Each structure stands twice: as C-alpha cells, then as structure tokens.
Amino acid sequence: MAALRYAGLDDTDSEDELPPGWEERTTKDGWVYYANHTEEKTQWEHPKTGKRKRVAGDLPYGWEQETDENGQVFFVDHINKRTTYLDPRLAFTVDDNPTKPTTRQRYDGSTTAMEILQGRDFTGKVVVVTGANSGIGFETAKSFALHGAHVILACRNMARASEAVSRILEEWHKAKVEAMTLDLALLRSVQHFAEAFKAKNVPLHVLVCNAATFALPWSLTKDGLETTFQVNHLGHFYLVQLLQDVLCRSAPARVIVVSSESHRFTDINDSLGKLDFSRLSPTKNDYWAMLAYNRSKLCNILFSNELHRRLSPRGVTSNAVHPGNMMYSNIHRSWWVYTLLFTLARPFTKSMQQGAATTVYCAAVPELEGLGGMYFNNCCRCMPSPEAQSEETARTLWALSERLIQERLGSQSG
C-alpha cells in the first residue's frame, strides 16, 4: 500500500502481528476491531496484546473513505487508483489507554518525513526548497509534493534538478512540482531567482533553506567571498530578504534554516567578543574546510533567530534544524577523505527520509504555528550553543550581511 510504503512501515511490528486467521479492521469513526475468520467473531481487543486501539489523524493525502452496499467501510487510493478494505491509517494506530498517559514524544530520530505528513493535505500551499535535487532536500521536496503542495526545487544544476522532478512525478504523476535555477554562490543568480518566482504571482508558505556545501577547497565566488560562507549563509540571507514581502503576504508562513550540531565547535567572534569577518570569509592561508562549514552553520542559527525576531510580528516564523549525523549524501563529494568517512559511517546513520523529518516537522506541524526562534534536533527542541543564542552577534551578522550584499551588487552595477 502506498501509505505504508511511503512511511517505511511495510513490515509489521512483531508485538502487534496477528495470529493466523485474524484480520484488523476499522469502524467509520476510527476504532480498530479484530475479526477472527476461523470462529467467525469480532472483538475490540488485540488477540495477542489485549490492547484496544484507534487510528490516528486523517487519511493520507489522496485517500477517501467510502461504504459498500453491505455497510462495510472501504478505502479508495485515488493516487495509485486502487481500492482496499484495509485502513491505511493502521500504520499509525495509538493505544486507547487514557488511564496510563505516556511522556514519550510523538516524533524522534527514527521518524520519517512521510510519517510526519501522514493525513495532511497541503493543496494550495507553495513550498520552495533550496538544494532539492538530492539528499534531504530532495526528500523534503518529495514529501510535500506527495501531499499536494506546489513544490519548487531551487537548484544550481538544472539537469539534476529536472531528474529530481521526474523521480517525484514517477511516484505520483499529478504532483505539482517544478525546478528553477538558483546558484547561491552568485548574488545575481539569487536576484534572478527571486524575480522569476515573483513573476509567477503565487504565495510562499514554506521556504526551506537547505542547500549547503561542505569540504570544498578554498575558493572565492565571483562576488569575492569565500564560497562556503556565501553558499551556506549569505546566499540564503539574500534570498529571504528578496522574498520576505511574499512571505509576509502569505502569512502564516515559515522559514526553515538547515544548520548542524557542528555549530557548537566554533565561534565567529574575536577575543574581544566582536564579530570577526576574517573568520567568516578567511584567506587561503587561514582556511580550513571543516571550520568554515562549522562557522557557516553557526551563522545559520543566528540568522534564523534574528529573522524570527524581525518577521514574526508579520506572521512569518523561522526555526533552525539539525538533520542528522553523517548522513550519506552528495554534500561530502569534494574530497575523497570525507567520502571514505561517510562510507564507513553509513551503517550508523539516518536514512534520507529520517534526515528530512526534522525539517518537515518544523515546516508543517500545527503545534508550531506562530512559534519560532528555536533550534530542533530529532524533531525535538534543544538549546543551541551560547554563541548561537547571542542577540548582539545575530544583529551584527545581519548588518554585516546587508552591507556585504550592497557592496558586491553596487560594485557590479558600477
């Protein structure tokens, strides 16, 4: 079934596995009951665990509940054009045991993006995901597209972006998904993307700043800045600046900035506690790829927090997220040492669907409506480093970012 397959729940939990001759069914109002075909009887309690259950939430996107001439509930999957008597929400049942409340959080590090969106319909919502042709960006884009959103993959490499669009359409031919050119290493490209997006005259409900570069040899962009800093921070900063009027008109809207736990292992201030530009865009002699990446991820959280402080009064919230440790993706492809490291770590990492979960959680769950200025890991709020919480550093970084953009674009126009 599509719902179970998308959620990664093809296999049944051994504890909930039914004995031979039993079948799991649901009532119209969502209660689970069990049919014993051998003895031709039904009961509310699971035959092995004795638990009562009910299904959680609405039907997955594209599904509809109907009743046949005998009064039996059945389900229509309009996306894959199939009919079944098995409720797709059975993958997401909850125990009916009000006397024993649990403190276990609803989602965690093993949750997938599709599980978070289960039962949600995003028809009419517009989502932009940068760096969406592979990895967690692709899984983020795909998850929203398969739930009805109009998704735009904002990518530098249009050939790979078009392939990503095709892969999504192969899963559902009616998905509303497209690719647009965005090179974060070139401020003019960011400008052109924003102009092209605005020309579509569509709202923007979710902007996911996902694209990043990692472990690059030292290089300067055409704008004269160190590449990791511009791609991971400044390009996204400029993109949000250019689209903030659309976000505000589309409120409630959300910005999600993909950061990393590696932000904890660096600082961007000098010994006097002042923002040090030479640490953000270092010379070749002072450059270390890992440190550059860590600093850019610290910038991501500072930017997200300051963005939330500025735009939340206008209905736009922003949160930063850590997707997961050492996930195998194309982000590491610049040096063979990192490729080897990621390969060795692969058995202990999250899947890409799990890596996209925290991003999708912050972008979609109703309980975060109107809330921002936070940092999330494994679908749970956690505190970032003290440096990342500094409002003074965030304001200074914001002002510096504005100045860098004005100087670069001003010199180019001249």
UniProtKB/Swiss-Prot annotation:
Disulphide-bonded residues: none
Entry-linked PROSITE patterns: WW_DOMAIN_1, WW_DOMAIN_2
Record's subcellular location: Cytoplasm; Nucleus; Mitochondrion; Golgi apparatus
The entry's keywords: Apoptosis, Cytoplasm, Disease variant, Epilepsy, Golgi apparatus, Lysosome, Mitochondrion, NADP, Neurodegeneration, Nucleus, Oxidoreductase, Phosphoprotein, Repeat, Tumor suppressor, Ubl conjugation, Wnt signaling pathway
Keyword Hydrolase part of the UniProt annotation: no
Description of how the protein assembles with itself and partners: Interacts with TP53, p73/TP73 and MAPK8. Interacts with MAPT/TAU, RUNX2 and HYAL2. Forms a ternary complex with TP53 and MDM2. Interacts with ERBB4, LITAF and WBP1. Interacts with DVL1, DVL2 and DVL3. May interact with FAM189B and SCOTIN. Interacts with TNK2. Interacts with TMEM207. Interacts (via WW domain) with VOPP1.
PANTHER family: RETINOL DEHYDROGENASE, WW DOMAIN-CONTAINING OXIDOREDUCTASE
Name of the protein this chain belongs to: WW domain-containing oxidoreductase
Protein species of origin: Homo sapiens (Human)
